[in-house]
Amino acid sequence: MRRIGAHVSIAGGIENAPMRAREIGATAFAMFTKNQRQWNAPPLTTQSIDAFKNNCAECGYHARHILPHDSYLINLGSPDPAKLERSRKAFTDEMQRVEALGLSLLNFHPGSHLNETGIDNCLNTIAESVNIALDNSSGVTAVLENTAGQGSNLGHTFEQLAAIIDQIEDKTRVGVCLDTCHLFAAGYDLRTSEAVEATFNEFDSIVSLSYLRGMHLNDAKLDLGSKRDRHESIGSGFIGNDGFAAIIQHPACDEIPLILETPNPDIWNREIEMLYQMEGDKR
């Protein structure tokens, strides 16, 4: 079965996220575990944790279908020692928050060298950062998200993702989330069934589909290889409906969270329904 949802708000408490996902007809969802614009956050209360778990059970959401995202402030490849240490502490805290919620995945952007160090050095730093977080948490998989190739952000090629994974000590606790807009912006074609098959095959040969833990389903506002992260509603961008039909029908997408981050939350319910229709609606 395909598990399709969106990145929902935690306003009013993290326990509200499952209910918001259910309201839009989602069978998976993503969320932040705290205010993503702040470094620090109070610990999750026992009441919020219990309510979150109860609401997930009531709405039928399993841990493997929930894809929390870490703060955008974190840079696990920072060339600045103080900022790197701050990022590592924040990322470890996010892993521990996910663990406390009874979840098993944490999605994150790899990191940026800020044009102050080499690519290989930054990839090594990112891997070391992930290893530190894994050593200080339990049962949570760190899920690398591919990037668009914008600026000095790393993770926009399958080779870079593979280089990070190669250095992770516990490979049972590392995975990948493929963002379709980022893939397309980085130069991986997704417009036809043939292109989708070729891109998945290339990922499998370089990284391995066994690491795929989720996807972000976003159309692209700009054309192939733009190196710019500009999301568009499904079917309204340069990837188009044919591309998303091929993606949603690909066997690699079975039973992993497929998360919308498209720009109009008011139509998420319609986009979810449209994607299910593309898949043949096997709910």
Curated annotation (Swiss-Prot):
Keyword Cell cycle: no
Amino acids binding Zn(2+) 1: H69, H109, E145
Cofactor binding: number and manner: Binds 3 Zn(2+) ions.
Pfam families: AP_endonuc_2 (PF01261)
E.C. code: 3.1.21.2
Superkingdom of the source species: Bacteria
Cofactor(s), names only, from the UniProt record: Zn(2+)
Record InterPro entries: AP_endonuc_2, AP_endonuc_F2_Zn_BS, Xyl_isomerase-like_sf, Xyl_isomerase-like_TIM-brl
Ligand binding (Zn(2+) 2): E145, D179, H216, E261
This protein's UniProt keywords: DNA damage, DNA repair, Endonuclease, Hydrolase, Metal-binding, Nuclease, Zinc
Reactions catalysed, as given in the entry: Endonucleolytic cleavage to 5'-phosphooligonucleotide end-products
GO terms classed as biological process: base-excision repair
Family membership: Belongs to the AP endonuclease 2 family.
Protein's job: Endonuclease IV plays a role in DNA repair. It cleaves phosphodiester bonds at apurinic or apyrimidinic (AP) sites, generating a 3'-hydroxyl group and a 5'-terminal sugar phosphate.
Name by which UniProt lists this protein: Probable endonuclease 4
UniProt source species: Prosthecochloris aestuarii (strain DSM 271 / SK 413)
